[in-house]
């Protein structure tokens, strides 16, 4: 059987919030090393990859590998019934067609028990090659969310230009243009407020803002976000999940003609 217990249950609630608007259903691959998920969005433009390592859970047991087909909207609705302070346990038998979700308050005065029907999903796994990137930008996740939201008022695509001294986000539309430039910070006391840039060569790429705004739903999971870019390959937007794993979003750049 499979059983995973998470004292900080709010993490799982935040993970579902980060997934449910982008993908409707996905296969949760459960093994002794942890839980992983990989899925294209419904329009096959972006890809999301989630890893939750077994040692990030407070207790974890998986006797044999399971592939659980989950409707993310249904799972999100059930997780909304859990309080932010609740302890969450996921449980499934080896050949089960349901996933049990148990929510306990810290004093265990209230225990809620839900069973969610699983789906049969035919999922192809895409190999994601390891890449060296021309530019890797690490910045506060709230700042990135704000930039994407603000520039969405101007246009539907953003040009991200990365150079040694800073990274620039630009959008243009019918009402005009907007440019936001972040300089690399030199001496920030708090690491999660810093902007750091590792650059091998300058990059200038255009991305659809509506997808970036979907990705920023993961902001509550991490104080920082990492953007990895190279010409002609998908951007990677990565949010670390403290002591547990990460959620990575992949988005191919737009061709110049489309964006003009």
From Swiss-Prot:
UniProt lists the family membership as follows: Belongs to the PCNA family.
The identity of this protein, by name, is: Proliferating cell nuclear antigen
Protein's GO biological process: leading strand elongation; mismatch repair; regulation of DNA replication; response to activity; response to bacterium; translesion synthesis
Q: Where in the cell is it found?
A: Nucleus
A Pfam match is: PCNA_C
- What organism does this protein naturally occur in? Haplochromis burtoni (Burton's mouthbrooder)
Role description: This protein is an auxiliary protein of DNA polymerase delta and is involved in the control of eukaryotic DNA replication by increasing the polymerase's processibility during elongation of the leading strand.
| Listed GO CC annotations | PCNA complex; PCNA-p21 complex
**Where is this chain primarily localised?**
nucleus
From the Swiss-Prot or TrEMBL record, what is one GO molecular function term?
Answer: DNA polymerase processivity factor activity
Q: Which UniProt keywords apply?
A: DNA replication, DNA-binding, Isopeptide bond, Nucleus, Ubl conjugation
User: Which residues form the Glycyl lysine isopeptide (Lys-Gly) (interchain with G-Cter in ubiquitin) crosslink?
Assistant: 164
> Is the Ribosomal protein keyword given for this protein?
no
Q: How does it assemble?
A: Homotrimer. Forms a complex with activator 1 heteropentamer in the presence of ATP. Component of the replisome complex.
Consult the record and explain the modifications the protein receives after translation: Monoubiquitinated by the ube2b-rad18 complex on Lys-164. Monoubiquitination at Lys-164 also takes place in undamaged proliferating cells, and is mediated by the dcx(dtl) complex, leading to enhance PCNA-dependent translesion DNA synthesis.
Signal peptide boundaries: none
